[in-house]
Amino acid sequence: MPDMGVFLLATQAVAPPGELLNLALNAGAIAPEGAVLVAMLATLLVDLAGEQAAARWVPPICYAGLGTALVLLAQQWNAPLEPSFLGAFLADNLAISFRAVVALSTLLSLLISWRYAEQSGTPIGEYAAILLAATLGAMLLCGSTDLVSVFVSLETLSVASYLLAGYMKRDARSSEAALKYLLVGSAAAAVFLYGASLLYGLSGTTSLQAIGLALLTSPTPLAALSLVFVLATVAFKIAAVPFHQWTPDVYEGSPTPVVAFLSVGSKAAGFALALRLLVGCFGAFDNQWKLLFTVLAVLSMTLGNVVALAQTSMKRMLAYSSIGQAGFVMIGLVCGTEDGFAAMVLYMAAYLFMNLGAFACIILFSIRTGSDRISDYAGLYQKDPLITLGLSLCLLSLGGIPPMLGFFGKIYLFFAGWADHQYLLVVVGLVTSVVSIYYYISVIKMMVVKEPKEASDVVKSYPSIKWSTIGMPPLRIALVGCVVVTAVGGILSNPLFQWANNAVAGTPLLQEAIALGSQRSIG
């Protein structure tokens, strides 16, 4: 049985010989996902008791489940690596980092969801359960090391995301967004399955490590074709150009808290998938997939930031902004160095807070005004200084203005790219960062510079606001927390980068890829 021999060879790097029982199960590796699953089931049971019981008990159940998951993830950090479920899942530091980003994005998305759901008349029990299901799929995807577990996790995330996008059934735009997302996502899933079938046919196994070993020993044109199919699926999940067409329409039509989760949690899972598949499986085609991702990164940074200039809707502007941000993260992926991977992890953590902070401000503004138009923010500083300050800081961080957290995230990415001689990516990144600063600053100027007589009609009729730190509602807690981390995180960038370096150092997959890349550069 040659495939079993390849399988054992692939798993010896992470599991001592003879520990086949741990290799077969080791269910403790998915204990954080178990906490999320228990919270999801409890949410569904509470929802059966009625809307009043759900409104009272669903939020604390979600907080408890996600909080427990984060604690369990912290306990797994730097723990001995033991593959789970016959090598289908591995809780290395890379998986822990991305799973933590996903869990935190869900927690913050829920904090900014309750008020929105209450005003729109959305049943929060069903909504929270579906969001937790998407979280479960995304977290499992971050640690999946087998084609079967990758596909099951990917579809769990995708199906839950389709339901979330169309959750506002009375809104035609939400239904349209869900339909578009479903059609494009189904096509991406079919393409992935075709690529996975080619990989299985070429290697005789579904283990990603074993597939990587098989392709290293005998690369074939069919393997290159499977690379194209897999890369298309990854590009769809991270909304890279030219696989981005669904993003603006889905972001505009979906409920805003759902967009917040899709822009961070789903994207983080997509980049974790990219690392597992491209670095783990296609080491034999390292130059080819890096060239393709270089093209995707240049297109994403350019189109995402240029088209965002013309947007009049805040959600559409942030949709195109997220496409550009994905291009920045791809710089670290293309580098394939320790600094590149670490900068990639750091920027995803920074993006979590600055993007969700911006969405928290947008949701609070839309709840009070019912508007999403950028022009309606004119003169907002007169009526709501906190939203103005919070949104301004988050947008400045997204643009890479010092001393915000986003500035240091981009600097680390650009330094890693320059050190790896990725001059084209760095130059395009710098130019498009300047372009992004223009449309971010234009929103800030709209809010701050306008005279009282030039304020929009929406702001003129803005309700009076009384801020108090005592008994702050969840939406304001999320807003203040994200803004504080975004503003102060730049000061703590060195410890954060050390954490990101530890994530890379504790991941054998990335260390092997770095060593292989060094050998090729020397040779």
Swiss-Prot record:
The gene is ndhB. GO terms for biological process: ATP synthesis coupled electron transport; photosynthesis, light reaction. The chain crosses the membrane at residues 29-49, 57-77, 94-114, 123-143, 147-167, 182-202, 223-243, 255-275, 291-311, 317-337, 345-365, 389-409, 424-444, 477-497. GO terms for molecular function: NADH dehydrogenase (ubiquinone) activity; quinone binding. It is a multi-pass membrane protein. This is NAD(P)H-quinone oxidoreductase subunit 2. It comes from the Bacteria. InterPro entries: NADH-Q_OxRdtase_suN/2, ND/Mrp_TM. It holds the Pfam family Proton_antipo_M.
